[in-house]
């Protein structure tokens, strides 16, 4: 029983070190909320993300975090959040922002936190990250695409619906968002579910399964 528990634990927390230890895709599920902040000139000045991990992953990581860091839970989660963000940095925080087909890199988040959130009597871990944009693309009149995904598809990310994407903007802007689901073939789905722990070359699979958020903003009185 102890061997099984350790195997499950390694599978669930392996993404923290970015070395996927086990197969069958996906292993964990993340529900996201994304907020885009535009200034009076219609420039994107900040992106705020919230990732809610599934109940099973959350329960195991809460226990493992306290055990590893040997600290009370709030302090242990601070240490774990720092490690998560550091490990996500080389992968651009699994985030892809395209404005008029040009990719904009996210800077390191100026604030982040890993906290326990309660919903319907259950506890979930939520990672929040706040990015102040160093490059400020203009949203007004632009074609904007936003995706968050694990390239290997070990973790499935989803906003679930467009209402989990919000856009804070000045009154002179009018913005809308649309959730676009991927077009998947039966062959691709079968391949993803056939993978086992020996598979390592799965880069690109996450992109194929990734949803896209399409954002359109217009200045009031302007028509494209």
Predicted regions and their residues:
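Structured domain cores in non-transmembrane regions
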Residues: 56-137
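N-terminal secretory signal peptides that target proteins for export/translocation
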Residues: 1-4
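Early extracytoplasmic/domain-onset interaction patches
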Residues: 26-59
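Mature, soluble, non-transmembrane domains
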Residues: 100-224
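Short solvent-exposed loop/turn micro-motifs enriched in small/polar/acidic residues
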Residues: 29, 88-90, 208
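Bacterial N-terminal signal peptides
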Residues: 6-19
């Amino acid at each position: 029983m102890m061997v099984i528990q350790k195997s499950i634990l390694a599978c669930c927390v392996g993404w923290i070190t970015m070395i996927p230890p086990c197969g069958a895709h996906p292993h964990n599920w993340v529900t996201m909320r994304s907020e885009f902040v535009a200034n009076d000139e219609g420039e994107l000045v900040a992106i705020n993300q919230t990732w809610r991990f599934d109940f099973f992953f959350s329960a195991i990581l809460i226990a493992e975090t306290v055990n590893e860091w040997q600290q009370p839970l709030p302090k242990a989660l601070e240490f774990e959040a720092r490690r998560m963000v550091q490990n996500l940095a080389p992968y651009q925080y699994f985030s892809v922002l395209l404005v008029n087909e040009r990719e904009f890199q996210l800077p390191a988040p100026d604030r982040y936190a890993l906290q326990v959130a309660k919903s319907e009597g259950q506890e979930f871990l939520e990672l929040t990250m706040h990015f102040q944009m160093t490059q400020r693309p203009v949203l007004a009149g632009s074609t904007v695409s936003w995706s968050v995904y694990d390239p290997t598809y070990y973790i499935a990310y989803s906003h679930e619906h467009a209402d989990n994407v919000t856009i804070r903007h000045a009154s002179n802007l009018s913005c809308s968002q649309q959730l676009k689901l991927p077009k998947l073939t039966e062959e691709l789905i079968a391949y993803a579910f056939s993978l086992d722990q020996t598979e390592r070359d799965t880069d690109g699979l996450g992109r194929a399964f990734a949803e896209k958020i399409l954002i359109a903003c217009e200045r009031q009185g302007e028509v494209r």
